[in-house]
Amino acid sequence: MCVICYIPKGVKTPSYRMLKAMHNANPHGQGFCTPSQFSKGLNFEYFVEQLRKRDINEPCIMHFRLATHGSIKKANCHPFNIDHTYFAHNGILSVRPMRDKTDSETAFIRYLYPYIEQYGLHSPEVEKMVYNLIESSKFAFMQGDDVRLFGHYEEMDGCYYSNLRFTYYIPRLHPFSF
């Protein structure tokens, strides 16, 4: 299952070790957005290089993908972007994916973005549409400095994670190692 990491403005980017653990658990691409940056792709080291340029005074949404729908390619990495509205998803949706699109991108294009465009990110109409789609998933949206999260996120060191399954991949010293 994918992982979303939301970094509020003023909070440091997770360590390389944490980023590598998220990648190892979800190796099918990664991406991030801030109000002034957007990058996604299949090359982890390039991702880290771009992320290092992040302005700590801006919020950031990162996503690490484990492919469940759609092929493994840059176009299927999150976040998805339409007119400076960014969307990342963690989970599986009951949405029939469009040809070679993920369930996430299909939901964003067909259902979520049209409501955001018409009513605004914080409208009751968007909230209702989200709750009609989300089931047990997690969503993250960004428009400029404005971030909106849906679903339960775990807080660790000031960052918010859609799940902590990736922590299994963090190298630890064995208590009896010498």
Model-found features: residue ranges?
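Short, surface-exposed beta-edge/turn micro-motifs
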Residues: M1-C2, H28-Q30, N57-P59, C77, ...
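Extreme N-terminus nucleophile/cap motif
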Residues: M1-L51, C60, H152-F178
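Fold-independent oxyanion-binding glycine-rich loops
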Residues: I7-G10, H63-L66, N90, E105, ...
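A short catalytic or substrate-binding loop motif that flags glycine-/basic-rich loops and adjacent residues
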Residues: H23-H28, S71-I72, Y131-I134
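PP2C/PPM family metal-dependent serine/threonine protein phosphatase catalytic domain
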Residues: N57-N76, F166-I170
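Acidic loop->beta-strand submotif enriched in PP2C/PPM serine/threonine phosphatases
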Residues: T68-Y86, M129
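Conserved beta-strand-loop-short alpha-helix elements that form
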Residues: H84-P97
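Short histidine
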Residues: S94-G151
